[in-house]
């Protein structure tokens, strides 16, 4: 069965490479599919089930709306490429329920989470080849007591991972029997824990480089991915204490093959590696902040120009920021109808303050006798 899946993937991949070389359009065999097609919905269901099974903590995701779908097929199998929005549910990760038995979390983020998935389907086998859901800014929640000694998830694009990844890859290259050095391919998951220093736990995969160990004692800027693709995925634990000026301790366990595609991971931006500079994320955040500020000013101006919008009584609950689109607007019924209606909690307006009770009006002036209680 696994052999059939590999052959199907190989055929589709070969067609993708063969098409442009023959002067044809890229991926000519990939065609649009109906968003409300039963097979497309089944592909999304498989992707969400697989994604939720791999969540280490938090809450499961459920389908909100299928945005776009396409498929590529041959005589033996069909691959579906789907884009959809999801929402956080009230079912915890690792529970017995599947997402179809859950409800949207009322306190979840109003903005849905965009997801992409690639699913292989044939008469004899169904398999999720890749699924990824882009995280969105978490809603503000009540403060909880901080666990100072517990592992904390950190962003896979954080600069703090540069040294732990470098130690891990260096350790692998020193211990492996490969004739070539390996370089970073993608990072899947990372946590940091305060111990006698910092303990990093990493999930990542690497790719063989063009630098042989005979010609290069260690990795350098001349090392690039080798055309002969060879991958290895690793779990690494790195203990560092920079203030003690001690050599970091890295425990790396690796196996051949890529990191599972359905695990939550991001591929590094082009040009990033432990040996290269990071992108200027601060500049991006500054740009986003200025854009948000401009939107707020524009919103305030529009409210001043239309006072009727402010005085409207009993407003309806706010809809999601990505409003559902009717299927009739697209010939392929995309986006699809929402799986369930999401109604975020409404913020009650504070009661209008009561005007202070007016003091009694004294027509005649007070005398000293009045203050003494004498008439």
From Swiss-Prot:
Residues bearing carbohydrate: 74, 235
Q: Where in the cell is it found?
A: Cytoplasm; Vacuole
Please describe the organ and tissue distribution of this protein's expression. Answer: Expressed in the skin, liver, intestine, spleen, pancreas and kidney.
This protein's major location comes to cytoplasm
Keyword terms of this UniProt record: Cleavage on pair of basic residues, Cytoplasm, Disulfide bond, Glycoprotein, Protease inhibitor, Signal, Thiol protease inhibitor, Vacuole
CDD domains xref list: CY
The protein's job, in short, is: Inhibits papain and ficin (cysteine proteinases) but not trypsin (a serine proteinase).
The protein here is known as: Kininogen
């Amino acid at each position: 069965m696994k052999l059939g899946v590999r052959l199907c993937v190989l055929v589709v991949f070969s067609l993708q490479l063969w098409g442009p070389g023959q002067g044809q359009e890229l991926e000519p065999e990939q065609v649009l599919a109906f968003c409300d097609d039963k097979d497309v919905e089944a592909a999304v269901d498989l992707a969400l089930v697989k994604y939720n099974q791999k969540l280490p903590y938090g809450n499961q995701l459920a389908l909100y709306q299928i945005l776009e779908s396409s498929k590529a097929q041959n005589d033996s199998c069909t691959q579906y490429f789907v884009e959809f929005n999801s929402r956080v549910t009230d079912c915890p990760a690792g529970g017995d329920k599947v997402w179809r038995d859950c409800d949207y979390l009322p306190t979840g983020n109003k903005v849905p989470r965009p997801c992409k998935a690639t699913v292989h389907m044939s008469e004899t086998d169904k398999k999720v080849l890749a699924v990824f859901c882009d995280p969105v800014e978490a809603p503000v929640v009540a403060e909880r007591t901080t666990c100072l000694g517990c592992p904390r998830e950190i962003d896979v694009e954080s600069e703090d991972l540069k040294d732990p990844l470098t130690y891990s890859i260096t350790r692998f290259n020193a211990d492996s029997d490969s004739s070539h050095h390996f370089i970073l391919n993608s990072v899947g998951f990372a946590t940091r824990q305060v111990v006698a220093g910092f303990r990093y736990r990493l999930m990542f995969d690497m790719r063989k480089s063009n630098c042989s160990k005979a010609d290069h004692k260690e990795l350098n800027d001349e090392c690039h991915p080798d055309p002969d693709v060879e991958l290895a995925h690793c779990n690494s634990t790195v203990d560092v204490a920079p203030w003690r000026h001690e050599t970091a301790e890295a425990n790396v366990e690796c196996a051949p093959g890529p990191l599972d595609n359905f695990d939550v991971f991001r591929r590094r931006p082009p040009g990033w590696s432990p040996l290269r500079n990071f992108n200027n994320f601060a500049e991006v955040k500054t740009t986003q902040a200025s854009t948000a500020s401009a939107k707020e000013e524009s919103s305030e101006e529009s409210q001043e120009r239309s006072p009727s919008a402010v005085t409207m009584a009993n407003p309806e609950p706010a809809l999601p920021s990505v409003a559902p689109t009717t299927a009739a607007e697209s010939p392929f019924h995309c986006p699809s109808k929402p799986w369930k209606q999401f109604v975020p909690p409404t913020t009650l307006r504070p009661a209008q303050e009561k005007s202070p009770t007016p003091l009694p009006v004294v027509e005649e002036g007070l005398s000293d006798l009045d203050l003494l209680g004498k008439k």
